[in-house]
Design a protein with these regions (language model features):
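Surface-exposed beta-strand edges and their flanking turn/coil or helix-capping segments
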Residues: 33-35, 54-55, 63-67, 108-112, ...
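Feature targets compositionally biased, intrinsically disordered low-complexity regions
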Residues: 44, 87, 92, 180-183
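Aromatic-enriched hydrophobic runs in primary sequence
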Residues: 9-10, 30, 54-56, 66-79, ...
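Interaction-surface and assembly-scaffold signal
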Residues: 116-244
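Short beta-strand element of the conserved SAM-dependent methyltransferase core
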Residues: 21-23, 79, 202
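Generic structural motif
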Residues: 26-28, 54-59, 82-86, 102, ...
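Aromatic- and glycine-enriched beta-alpha-beta binding-site module
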Residues: 60-144
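Hydrophobic, proline/glycine-rich low-complexity stretches
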Residues: 1-62, 213-244
Length: 244
């Protein structure tokens, strides 16, 4: 029997009601943020950045229920990279530009242990389920109140995306990468099953990307995403990171 090389589990949770808005951008926007040892991962020659909003539920740290904030929202801005291994394999992963949560404690833990750019803001969400019709999903955040909003009407129909689709590219990056100063690049594994996708045509994105992220992303406030879709989600496991 072979010995598992997987790292120990750091965090497990349910990720639910995920909204994705995916924008085509020029690679030069993201190249300064690419962690050492990785490179941008393109889809059909195009570079993407994604706004993702979802719910954490039943959060467990080191296999123990979180004492506080087991259920909360997250909104993140992310892009996609890959790392070539010596044996020829390729690991496809995500780099987070900024992750917004409603708790200062959660933000501190994530910054300290993973070097991720987490911040705490006021947040809210609303999920309206209609078992016979569309689902209404809304997330919002802001400094003085939830003034930035991402909402959508989600149809009931869903499908498993094919391996070469944009939806598969967006949802099936199973590694995370961050640069933590003197520690260099940290790589961690994220495990979840393949998610069925609901295509979304009715949505509203009212975000001040400049104030939330940086002036370089201000153009996204006036841009239309290439695609918007929804995933119900699943249980997710995040393993301890390691320097690469």
């Amino acid at each position: 029997m072979g010995i598992s090389r997987k790292r120990p589990v750091f965090l497990s949770a349910d990720w639910h009601n995920l909204l994705f808005a995916n924008y085509t951008v020029t690679p030069s926007l993201l190249e300064p943020l690419v962690p050492d040892g990785t490179q941008l991962d393109l889809w059909n020659g195009s570079c993407f950045i994604s706004l993702v909003a979802f719910q954490f539920r039943n959060t467990r740290v080191l296999r123990m229920p979180a004492l506080m904030n087991r259920d909360f929202e997250e909104i993140n801005l992310r892009f996609y990279v890959k790392r070539a291994l010596a044996n020829g394999d390729v690991r496809r992963g995500v780099v987070f530009i900024k992750e917004i949560v409603p708790s200062r404690l959660i933000a501190w833990v994530a910054r300290t242990l993973y070097g991720e750019n987490y911040v705490a803001l006021n947040m809210a969400h609303e999920i309206q389920n209609d078992h016979e019709g569309p689902r209404m999903v809304s997330y919002s955040c802001g400094e003085k109140g939830p003034c930035n909003r991402f909402s959508a009407t989600v149809p009931t129909a869903s499908l498993i995306p094919g391996p070469t689709t944009l939806e598969s590219y967006i949802t099936e990056h199973y590694w995370g990468y961050s640069e933590t100063g003197a520690k260099g690049t940290v790589e961690y594994e994220v495990e979840h099953p393949q998610w069925p996708v609901h295509q979304v045509s009715e949505y509203n994105i009212d975000f001040d990307f400049q104030s939330l992220y940086d002036a370089r992303y201000a153009f996204l406030s006036e841009s239309s995403p290439t695609s918007v879709f929804f995933c119900t989600g699943s249980d997710v496991t995040v393993r301890w990171g390691t320097k690469v």
